A protein has these predicted regions:
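Transmembrane-helix signature of polytopic, membrane-embedded enzymes
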Residues: 110-134, 153-154
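Membrane-proximal lumenal/periplasmic loop motifs of glycosylation machinery
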Residues: 35-40, 55-81, 85-96
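Perimembrane helix-loop-helix junctions
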Residues: 5, 192-222
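Membrane-interface transmembrane helices that cradle and orient dolichyl/undecaprenyl
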Residues: 151, 156-174
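Helix-to-loop transition at the C-terminal end of transmembrane segments
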Residues: 29-48, 223-227
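Transmembrane-helix motifs of polytopic, lipid-linked glycan transferases
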Residues: 97-118, 158-162
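Start-transfer (signal-anchor) and selected internal transmembrane alpha helices
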Residues: 1-29
């Protein structure tokens, strides 16, 4: 298995500086562009309304795990309510800032993948930050309930990197499985990608790894039957 190049050494400081500068630039542009036009939408109010209203009666597990438009969005629920607890609901700016930080993570994952497939580090550093703006500054770039799609995808890419591309250690299996479970917890739509990892292992006859890869899917199945 090819090893990821080290991109934090002295020889790559310029590339890293370019990457983080562009991420900061795009994030700032999005905040400036939408700071007066963003607001909470029906998905947010559903979380703040019915879930919080039933918290005392139905318990914390129902609060986190109850379906939202037929999906598990426990991570989104904790994200919304946690920020509201600290900042209130007068301004959407704290949500926009956290979305920019999360999209930095998405860009970083793509940055690493680009280097892995052989793209020049400087070219990757220039291209990857464009995942911050997602085409013509669409709502996925600043609205949390849509941003979770790309954030979950990034966790699934981390899952694939550790679980499929590096099966040489138990640590890699644990990291890959944990990333998948976290991605599904944030938004369950990414559960559809888990069978891809399992299929790769079955083709390679790596039965133990295929079993480990199935754990997030099994956990999702239990949630689906329970809630």
């Amino acid at each position: 298995v090819l090893k990821l190049p080290k991109i934090i050494g002295l020889g790559h400081r310029r590339e890293l500086a370019v990457f983080w500068f562009l991420c900061a630039l795009f994030g700032t542009l999005i905040l400036l562009r939408y700071r007066h036009h963003s607001a909470f939408f029906i998905d947010d109010w559903t979380i703040f309304g019915s879930r919080l209203g039933h918290l005392d009666r139905l318990g914390f597990d129902d609060f986190v795990l109850r379906r939202h438009n037929e999906h598990l969005m426990g991570g989104m629920v904790l994200w919304d309510v946690g920020l509201a607890k600290f900042f209130g609901l007068r301004n959407y700016l704290p949500w926009m800032i956290t979305v920019q930080l999360a999209n930095c993570f998405v860009s970083w994952v793509f940055f690493r993948y680009m280097i892995r497939v052989g793209l020049a580090t400087l070219v990757a550093a220039i291209i990857a930050p464009f995942f911050m703006i997602w085409a013509p500054l669409g709502s996925v770039a600043y609205w949390a309930p849509e941003a979770v799609f790309t954030i979950s995808l990034a966790f699934l890419m981390v899952h694939f990197r550790y679980l499929v591309l590096d099966t040489s250690s138990n640590k890699a299996l644990i990291l890959g499985t944990s990333a998948a479970m976290l991605g599904i917890f944030i938004h369950s739509i990414c559960a559809v990608l888990i069978p891809i990892s399992m299929t790769v292992f079955v083709i390679q006859r790596k039965w133990r790894s295929a079993f480990v890869a199935s754990v997030p899917l099994v956990m999702y199945g239990l949630w689906f039957l329970t809630y």
